[in-house]
Design a protein with these regions (language model features):
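Basic/polar, cationic surfaces and motifs that engage anionic cell-wall
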Residues: 2-7, 24-25, 101-188
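Peptidoglycan-targeting cell-wall enzymes and recognition modules
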Residues: 51-141
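N-terminal catalytic cores of peptidoglycan-degrading enzymes
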Residues: 1-91
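Conserved, mostly hydrophobic/aromatic
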Residues: 33, 98, 168
Length: 188
């Protein structure tokens, strides 16, 4: 896999048309890693590419390693919303947004782990964060997703002056993604 003309090539990446994004980035120096909170990478990518949707991302990474690119890396995507980090606001202007297909935080209901959208998650796919006063439960990322995320971040750092890899929970108090499982990755 490589980056040519601000797009990923090879590696099975599927390029979707997302015409709503046209403002150019001037040297992105940040990667923001999100979770989709949805049921599939394809559904999330197709939704984010719709003209009427006021959100987008550069990439969506599926649980089995599927990869979608919606916006070139030199173009602003609408993923960070109202945000600030390192003394700067409006981070869409400085960042590349990567969405990981993941249901996010889970609830324990009647003996089952359930996502906000109502999908039940098998215990083997649950990440338990017991560092706080009460344990919290999260949809586990797949090894394929984590491996692909690392590879893509490495490529992006080779092509752009990336200084930060953060999650929405680092740039706004409205969000909790990508969750505690990726905390060690985000700090690197």
């Amino acid at each position: 896999m490589e980056i040519l003309k601000h797009r990923l090539v090879d590696g099975g990446v599927q390029h979707l048309v997302c015409r709503k994004n046209s403002r150019k980035l001037s040297g992105p120096d940040m990667i923001v890693v999100h979770y989709t909170a949805g049921t599939s990478a394809c559904t999330a990518a197709e939704f984010l590419a719709k003209e009427e949707v006021k959100a987008s991302a550069h990439l969506v990474i599926g649980r089995q390693g599927e990869l979608f690119q919606l916006v070139p890396f030199d173009t602003e995507a609408w993923h960070a919303g109202r945000s600030c980090y390192g003394g700067r606001a409006n981070l869409n202007r400085y960042s590349i947004g990567i969405e990981l297909d993941n249901l996010g935080r889970l609830q324990w209901r009647e003996g089952h782990f359930v996502a906000e959208c109502g999908v039940e998650v098998a215990p083997v796919d649950v990440y338990v964060d017991d560092t706080g006063e009460l344990a919290t439960f999260w949809h586990r990322y797949t090894e394929r997703q984590k491996r692909l995320l690392r590879e893509i971040c490495r490529l992006l750092k080779q092509h752009y002056p990336i200084r930060y890899v953060v999650g929405p929970s680092d740039i706004t108090d409205r969000k909790q993604d990508p969750g505690p499982e990726l905390h060690g990755f985000m700090c690197k």
